[in-house]
A protein has these predicted regions:
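Walker A (P-loop) ATP-phosphate-binding motif of ABC ATPase nucleotide-binding domains
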Residues: 6
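Hydrophobic anchor at the beta1->P-loop junction of P-loop NTPases
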Residues: 9
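P-loop (Walker A) phosphate-binding loop of NTP-binding proteins
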Residues: 12
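Conserved lysine of the Walker
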Residues: 17
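Conserved substrate/cofactor phosphate-moiety recognition/catalytic segment
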Residues: 22-66
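Loop/turn-to-beta-strand initiation segments
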Residues: 72-78, 98
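Conserved phosphate-donor/acceptor-positioning beta-strand/loop module used by diverse small-molecule
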Residues: 93-112
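Small-molecule kinase domains that catalyze NTP-dependent phosphoryl transfer to phosphate-bearing small molecules
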Residues: 115-156
Length: 157
């Protein structure tokens, strides 16, 4: 098992996964990957069309995320990982992964999503929040409120 950390920064769209994950990776001295870049083209097209992904859509993507983590000596990945079963799937490939859940109010998530350009439209936020299962006490990781400066949030993780 590697001593360099493998971390997934998780949360719904707009929670700050990319910004906090990139800052955390720099702080830890490891690489950073945004799992949005690992989505199959069909998933991106589906979301751009305003349709939420289902478990069948997510399965191959989560397998890629897990494999990417498993193959890296240390890595931070920004990945929604909204449901425990998704995190379990990632952990199956990378058992030593730890999760950092970014906690942000639904109102703030909506505001952030409306102020950026992304393939995930704000209309899909409700489906993400309905899918969200907060990190369980028995899961390896921590929940962090994403308020304040990005570097401060990353260091609280």
């Amino acid at each position: 098992m590697s001593t360099a950390p493998r971390v997934v920064v998780m949360g719904p769209s707009g929670s700050g996964k990319t910004a906090v994950g990139a800052a955390l990776a720099v702080d830890l001295g490891v690489d950073f990957v945004d799992a949005d870049d690992l989505h199959p083209a069909a998933n991106v097209e589906k979301m751009e069309a305003g349709h939420p992904l289902d478990d069948d859509d997510r399965a191959p993507w989560l397998d890629i995320v897990g494999q990417t983590l498993a193959e890296a000596p240390g890595l931070v990945v920004a990945c929604s990982a909204l449901a425990r079963r998704y995190r379990d799937r990632i952990r199956a490939a990378a058992p030593d992964v730890r999760f950092v859940e970014l906690v942000v109010s639904p109102e703030e998530l909506d505001r952030r999503m409306r102020s950026r350009q992304h393939f995930m439209p704000p209309a899909l936020l409700a489906s993400q929040l309905a899918t969200l299962e907060h990190l369980g006490a028995d899961e390896p990781g921590v929940a962090v409120e994403n308020v304040g400066r990005i570097l401060d949030v990353a260091r609280r993780a």
